[in-house]
Every structure is written in structure tokens, then in C-alpha cells.
Amino acid sequence: MPRISKIRVAALNLVIENGYDGFTMEELAHKVGVSRRTLFNYIKDKESAVLGSEMSEEVENQFQNFAAGLPTGSLREDSKIMAMTVFNRAVGDEFFPEISQLTAQALATDTKLRALYCQRNSRIIQRVRQAVQAR
């Protein structure tokens, strides 16, 4: 399993066991078997450890291309391409089924994580809205 996936699985398990505020990044690093410093080479913060990175460079580039009428010039085709890029980024990890199941379990057990998840989704929806309006 790639280290970034190990980090997510460990972070999600810690949320399920202790709640979002119930563990430290030091504990997460220990569970993954890396130093705290090494942990931060892979993730930005606790939220990204638990929920994954919010917006990759690839996805942001796709939003910019979409807003500019690229790559095909067809709204329908470009919408499909943008949606598939976002979807593939979210589920492209071969460990997606396990991570998805753990995420659902963590969201069901922790209200703070649910709030962070909703805020993140609102930001992504806003970014999609901006790209559509720019087009």
C-alpha cells in the first residue's frame, strides 16, 4: 500500500477509535511508522491526513482549462472530462474501497469531521461554480 494510503487508513482508524480531536499528529506518525517530520512530507495537516488532499494541481488545471473552453470547446464534452478528472482523483487509488468504507464510518461517528467534510465539499462546489460561470 502506498504510504499516503497508509496515512489515510491510519488517520481514519484513529478518528473511529478516538474522534477527530482525540489523536495527535505524533500518534498518527507513530501508527504509520514514520517521524512526524516525514509525515508532513506527505500531508499538509490533520484534515488532509483524514480526508485526503482537497485539490490537486491536476484538478485545478482542469478547472482552469474548463473555464477557458478547453480542451474540446464542447460544453458537454468538457464537462464530462472535468467530472472524470475530479472523480478519478477521488477514487483513483486502488485502496479506494477500504478508504471509502473507513471514511463513511468515521463521518458517522464524528460530528467535527462531518462539519469539515461539508465545508470541504462546499469549497469544491464553489470552485465548480466559478469554472462554469467563467465559461
Regions found by a protein language model. Give the residues of each.
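Basic, helix-initiating cap at the start of DNA-binding domains
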Residues: 1-33, 70
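Hydrophobic/aromatic residues within well-ordered alpha-helical segments
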Residues: 3, 46, 79, 83, ...
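HTH DNA-binding helix-turn interface
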Residues: 18-20, 40-56
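Key DNA-contact positions within bacterial/archaeal DNA-binding proteins
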Residues: 37
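Hydrophobic alpha-helical connector segments
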Residues: 62-96, 100
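Amphipathic alpha-helical packing segments from all-alpha helical-bundle domains
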Residues: 106-135
